[in-house]
Swiss-Prot record:
Gene3D superfamilies, per the entry: Photosystem II CP47 reaction center protein
Gene name for this UniProt entry: psbB
This protein's record includes keyword Membrane: yes
Name by which UniProt lists this protein: Photosystem II CP47 reaction center protein
Primary location recorded for the protein, binned into one broad class: plastid
Quaternary organization: PSII is composed of 1 copy each of membrane proteins PsbA, PsbB, PsbC, PsbD, PsbE, PsbF, PsbH, PsbI, PsbJ, PsbK, PsbL, PsbM, PsbT, PsbX, PsbY, PsbZ, Psb30/Ycf12, at least 3 peripheral proteins of the oxygen-evolving complex and a large number of cofactors. It forms dimeric complexes.
Cofactor note: Binds multiple chlorophylls. PSII binds additional chlorophylls, carotenoids and specific lipids.
Organism: Eucalyptus globulus subsp. globulus
Length: 508
């Protein structure tokens, strides 16, 4: 046929058997990739430290999605929450990966079968004997089946009625675990951070899908609507399917980047807005304040801060700090976190407590400025020593650590004080191992950033695909350059399959 590469899909027009075949093969490729990627990630994943080296620091992409749906154990004897297990059961990480690979193989065989046996009776119109698909009926069947799956997921899997539940955590990502979730039928169900909304919305959407599917199975579209929306043309199906996919991609890009109950920070890492708003810093200060109110010393109050919470309050975990073209996991950037050094408190020679101004998200370098409780600049690390008035040396700044590995240690040496002031710009201070992975010290994004970028990019691409194919199917006669009612010698362009023998000819 000699088709150019961008026209090859012409071969499955008016050929329902092979159209089905290529879609089954596509499913085989997707499932095969998912299973293979899961096995690769399991081969390189280190589960030994879920607090300072969680899956999102290691650049895991498919493991978080399995985990949020209730998979926590491995046949290797470890659990994602830490510790060891003896009986992980069939639905472990490896079990899910294997199921995808087996499913991929079956789809591969089914695709070959449908490619060879393409001319099935079921695809033929009994009145004409020609290949024909009842597209509105197929739409009803698919809508009904997807409604059943959606309802089943919400009513059984998420609620724990028949399934494990989903990953649920507190607002600060400290206590996450898989547990059943009750549907939230009140207004709270519309809060994107309430897990109950996941159950209730799937139940509601599934019910709607079942009813809509039954409607489209039992009611035929009016002739004017059928012709106006070109419901008999397979390209109409392509256009509307692309619309559904790009809409879903835009939605999940939003829920991932801005955060929601479906994208827990324990599995995908914190969002950039939690750094921008000082979300974890405020909670840490609240806990320290509560400890001091109970007559704890500063050292005791800071020592009670969970290392996990302190680690979230570190700019290296901000997904917006990694450039789009910096390949690799976060651990390949600033290194593997080994331990929290503690919280540094800076004071000038007059005893005032000073706070280091933190680096905003989109800065690579930022001046080191220390302010007092009223926001007045009291010290800095000057660019030009000759004009400095607030240098660490001139102001006599000291630093003392509370909590962490350096608890109770203080420094007055200006070089050391400046070193920790620079590091305090980046949030809580951690010891990072850059030798093991030969980390280069340049921040990387988390899977949250990659997922968002990928889905937003493809959503935009698919949006144009929807416009393109929608325009082609709606204005097919215009693009072909003929009037469909014109009795021309050869109706060139009215038939989409090259070499179609049914093209009407007229002898002049």
């Amino acid at each position: 046929m000699g088709l150019p590469w961008y026209r090859v899909h012409t071969v499955v027009l008016n050929d329902p058997g092979r159209l089905l075949s290529v879609h089954i093969m596509h499913t085989a490729l997707v499932a095969g990739w998912a299973g293979s990627m899961a096995l690769y990630e399991l081969a390189v994943f280190d589960p030994s430290d879920p607090v300072l080296d969680p899956m999102w620091r290691q650049g895991m992409f498919v493991i978080p999605f399995m985990t949020r749906l209730g998979i926590t154990n491995s046949w290797g004897g470890w659990s994602i929450t830490g510790g060891t297990i003896t009986n992980p059961g069939i639905w472990s990480y490896e079990g899910v990966a294997g199921a995808h690979i087996v499913f991929s193989g079956l789809c591969f065989l089914a695709a070959i079968w449908h490619w060879v046996y393409w001319d099935l009776e079921i695809f033929c119109d009994e009145r004409t004997g020609k290949p024909s698909l009842d597209l509105p009926k197929i739409f009803g069947i698919h809508l009904f089946l997807s409604g059943v799956a959606c309802f089943g997921f919400g009513a059984f899997h998420v609620t724990g009625l028949y399934g494990p539940g989903i990953w649920v955590s507190d607002p600060y990502g400290l206590t996450g675990k898989v547990q059943p979730v009750n549907p939230a039928w009140g207004v709270e169900g519309f809060d994107p951070f309430v897990p109950g909304g996941i159950a209730s919305h799937h139940i509601a959407a599934g019910t709607l899908g079942i009813l809509a599917g039954l409607f489209h199975l039992s009611v035929r579209p009016p002739q004017r609507l059928y012709k106006g929306l070109r419901m008999g043309n397979i390209e109409t199906v392509l256009s509307s399917s692309i619309a559904a996919v790009f809409f879903a991609a835009f939605v999940v890009a939003g829920t991932m980047w801005y955060g929601s109950a479906t994208t827990p920070i324990e599995l995908f890492g914190p969002t950039r807005y939690q750094w921008d708003q000082g979300y974890f810093q405020q909670e840490i200060y609240r806990r320290v304040g509560a400890g001091l109110a109970k007559n704890q010393s500063l050292s005791e109050a800071w020592s009670k801060i969970p290392e996990k919470l302190a680690f979230y309050d570190y700019i290296g975990n901000n997904p917006a700090k990694g450039g789009l073209f910096r390949a690799g996991s976060m651990d390949n950037g600033d290194g593997i976190a080994v331990g929290w050094l503690g919280h540094p408190i800076f004071r000038d020679k007059e005893g005032r407590e000073l706070f280091v101004r933190r680096m905003p998200t989109f800065f690579e370098t930022f001046p080191v400025v220390l302010v007092d409780g009223d926001g007045i600049v009291r010290a800095d690390v000057p660019f030009r020593r000759a004009e400095s008035k607030y240098s660490v040396e001139q102001v006599g700044v000291t630093v003392e650590f509370y909590g962490g590995e350096l608890n109770g240690v203080s420094y007055s040496d200006p070089a050391t004080v400046k070193k920790y002031a620079r590091r305090a710009q980046l949030g809580e201070i951690f010891e990072l191992d850059r030798a093991t992975l030969k980390s280069d010290g340049v921040f990387r994004s988390s899977p949250r950033g990659w997922f968002t970028f990928g889905h937003a990019s493809f959503a935009l691409l698919f949006f144009f695909g929807h416009i393109w194919h929608g325009a082609r199917t709606l204005f097919r006669d215009v693009f072909a350059g003929i009037d469909p009612d014109l009795d021309a010698q050869v109706e060139f362009g009215a038939f989409q399959k090259l070499g179609d023998p049914t093209t009407r000819r007229q002898v002049v």
